[in-house]
Swiss-Prot record:
Assembly behavior: Homodimer.
Organism field: Crocosphaera subtropica (strain ATCC 51142 / BH68) (Cyanothece sp. (strain ATCC 51142))
Any GO MF annotation of the entry: glutamyl-tRNA reductase activity
Protein name listed in UniProt: Glutamyl-tRNA reductase
Function: Catalyzes the NADPH-dependent reduction of glutamyl-tRNA(Glu) to glutamate 1-semialdehyde (GSA).
Pathway as given in its UniProt record: Porphyrin-containing compound metabolism; protoporphyrin-IX biosynthesis; 5-aminolevulinate from L-glutamyl-tRNA(Glu): step 1/2; Porphyrin-containing compound metabolism; chlorophyll biosynthesis
This protein's record includes keyword Repeat: no
Gene3D superfamilies linked: Glutamyl-tRNA reductase, N-terminal domain (3.30.460.30), NAD(P)-binding Rossmann-like Domain (3.40.50.720)
Gene (UniProt): hemA
């Protein structure tokens, strides 16, 4: 059994590739069921955010398991394998463990140290439990990752004042306009990202903000959090009318297809006013063809990289502090995993050797007869037990210390074969 992660992120793939592989929460159960149907995948969990899709799996055969995950990604994204492979990364064993801990800590985020990813890792864990995607190994790994993420945020300052995707989008907007207070601004969507957009827009002086959302209740819940902002709430039916009156539009919905495109924008945007679009959704809410309209400027999540570059520079030292904490958590998981694998074999070997010792001791004592004093029997008992312990001690220490997973498994298999040990493999992972 080995742990592998196959995926892509803002570091390896552009948004036009990431959006094809985005898996909405409503589709997670189907994805987990599909993946667990492959012959070499025992456990699986899926992290899907605007900046990454990562599939963590416990595989019975590393190479074949990775091929199965890659095939799955090709199928759901309708992307040829030859094209997809250039954007994927694959990490195995301890590298996969370390990567998940880094993700949970915000060290792999576009915005270094951002806090939203930890909540997303928690959601992945809960959904994987709910839909029976994970077993003992990944359950422990995700718990370790959540612990690591919490430690990094409580024991370092990396999360203090960290920008988010939403705040980065607002910062980008500020570089494009002189004064937010003089602009009509609309936000399409009323989820967590939209809430953060309102927070940062209000902080930067925006006074005219309209929320466009399908659910009136969700929009009202958002507005209650900002009573001082006097937000205007409208239904999705009025979206294009609102967009036509706006100077800046931020989109943050769960739509799987673009909701703004060249045809519907051309009808409502005036040449005198123009329009700036900031799309922080993946899949994108704004079609690429809007760039053909001279009166429209459109930006997506990949355009935020320049904005967050300064954030990375100022947080590198804090990231180094976080790395040390993460290594402690990686080692804690590795120790647990090593014990999980080695304990059944060691226990079985000790039981077998002890049985042999007792049998041979009994034979020897029976030959010596009843005249052999009881105190002498105790000495021989201690002697044989000491010999067994001395012989087994060093091999067991070396086995537990073996950090290379495949080498450790080869050692275990050799022990099981050489001593004819009957190990129930399921006990190690059940």
């Amino acid at each position: 059994m080995n742990i592998a992660v196959v995926g892509l992120s803002h570091k390896t793939a552009p948004v036009e590739v990431r959006e094809k592989l985005s898996i909405q929460e409503a589709k997670i159960e189907e994805a987990l069921t599909h993946l667990k149907g492959y012959p070499h995948i025992e456990e699986v969990a899926v992290i899907s955010t605007c900046n990454r899709l990562e599939i963590y799996a416990v595989v019975t055969d590393t190479e074949k398991g990775v091929v199965e995950i890659t095939q799955f990604l090709s199928e759901i994204g309708h992307i040829p394998l030859s094209y997809l492979r250039r954007y994927l990364f694959t990490l195995l064993h301890q590298d996969a463990v370390r990567h998940l801990l880094r993700v949970a800590a915000g060290l792999e985020s576009l915005v270094l140290g951002e806090g939203q990813i930890l909540a997303q890792v928690k959601t992945t864990h809960k959904l994987s439990q709910k839909y029976k995607g994970i077993g003992r190994l990944l359950d422990r790994l995700f718990k370790q990752a959540i612990t690591a993420g919490k430690r990094v945020r409580s024991e370092t300052n990396i999360g203090t004042g960290a920008v988010s995707i939403s705040s980065a989008a607002v910062e980008l907007a500020i570089t494009k306009v002189d004064d937010l207070a003089t602009r009509n601004i609309s936000i399409i969507g009323a989820g967590k990202m939209a809430c953060l957009l309102v927070k940062h827009l209000v902080a930067k002086g925006a006074t005219s903000i309209t929320i466009v959302n399908r659910s009136q209740r969700r929009a009202e819940e958002l507005a209650k959090k900002f009573p001082q902002a006097e937000l205007t709430l409208v239904s999705l039916d009025e979206m294009m009318s609102v967009v036509g009156k706006s100077h800046l539009v931020f989109t943050s919905t769960g739509a799987t297809e673009p909701i703004l495109h060249q045809d519907n924008l051309r009808e409502v945007v005036s040449a005198e006013q123009g329009l700036m679009l900031f799309d922080i959704s993946v899949p994108r809410n704004v079609a690429t063809n809007v760039q053909d309209l001279e009166i429209v400027e459109a930006y997506n999540v990949d355009d935020l990289k320049a904005v967050v570059a300064q954030n990375h520079a100022s947080r590198r030292q804090m990231a180094l502090e976080a790395e040390g904490l993460l290594e402690e958590e990686v080692e804690a998981f590795e120790l647990w995993w090593r014990s999980l694998e080695t304990v059944p074999t060691i226990s079985c070997l000790r039981t077998k050797v002890e049985s042999i010792r007792e049998q041979e001791l009994e034979k020897a004592l029976s030959r010596l007869g009843t005249e052999f004093a009881e105190k002498h029997q105790e000495v021989i008992e201690a002697l044989t037990r000491g010999i067994v312990n001395k012989i087994l001690h060093e091999p067991m220490v070396q086995l537990r210390a073996q950090q290379d997973i495949e080498a450790r498994q080869r050692c275990l298999q050799s022990l099981q074969m050489l001593f004819d040990l009957e190990i129930e493999i399921e006990k190690q992972f059940s």
